[in-house]
Amino acid sequence: MKTLRSVFFYFTIVWSTIVLGASAVILFYTTLKHAAPHACSRLWGKVNLWAAGVQVEVKGLENVDSLKPCIYAANHQSWFDIFAILAKLPVQFRWLAKEELFKIPVLGIAMTANG
């Protein structure tokens, strides 16, 4: 069952990255706003957490003020941090990422569209 879940997850991450990444890029260039691509990214995070069978418990959301600038830092225990932040953080935000990630075909363009 574990192998089946892994195959399902990797299939889902590839296709969700292509479909939602392309959607984010198209929405950015047609609306010239970051809100629509961010919504695609949030969905991408939720879909991939679901496909992996991961449940995320978030504590302290009452301390998040969307009206004040803030820096959110993940401890980056795994790449699931990315999915969790996208799926659970209730504010629109921008990423800092290493240069190599922007060279990945669909992902790099989608990351640029997200700001």
Can you say where each PLM-predicted feature lies in the sequence?
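A transmembrane-helix-recognition feature enriched in membrane-embedded lipid enzymes
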Residues: M1-E57, I109-A110
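Conserved H-X4-D acyltransferase segment
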Residues: R5-T12, S41-A97
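Mid-sequence acidic-hydrophobic segments that form the walls
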Residues: S23, Q92, A113
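Short alpha-helical
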Residues: A35, F80, F102
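Soluble catalytic domains of enzymes that build or remodel membrane lipids, polysaccharides, and related
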Residues: L96-A97, L101-G115
